[in-house]
Amino acid sequence: MSMQDPIADMLTRIRNGQAASKVAVSMPSSKLKVAIAKVLKEEGYIAGYSVAGDVKPELEIELKYFQGKPVVELIQRVSRPGLRIYKRTTDLPKVMGGLGVAIVSTSKGVMTDRAARKASMGGEIICYVA
């Protein structure tokens, strides 16, 4: 059986892993998943990530906790295969009043909403993280 939305699966694995206080979660790798993991690492939401394997690469994400609580409070898919959500620079959302980030896929790659605003670029809103 094929997976319909691999990005939603990735976000769910992160959410469930933190709810179960896991050290790390692993999943099948793709370029987009690695780009999202890179943004999450830069923003401090995960401790790290690594890709292992040649034939079927696996992405392993090391989860991050602060005083025993998960760093990620909210991780929510926005644009999905059945309903893509695109926003212009001026319409990019501020997650939790600027405390969280929206991960945006632009023509220059995957970046946060702040970086997209700074570069005056819109794009597809992949997910919200706070």
UniProtKB/Swiss-Prot annotation:
It holds the Pfam family Ribosomal_S8. This is Small ribosomal subunit protein uS8. PANTHER family: 40S RIBOSOMAL PROTEIN S15A. Keywords: Ribonucleoprotein, Ribosomal protein, RNA-binding, rRNA-binding. One of the primary rRNA binding proteins, it binds directly to 16S rRNA central domain where it helps coordinate assembly of the platform of the 30S subunit. Part of the 30S ribosomal subunit. Contacts proteins S5 and S12. NCBIfam families: PRK00136.1. GO terms for biological process: translation. Signal peptide: none annotated. Belongs to the universal ribosomal protein uS8 family. One of its GO terms (molecular function) is rRNA binding. GO terms for cellular component: ribonucleoprotein complex; ribosome.
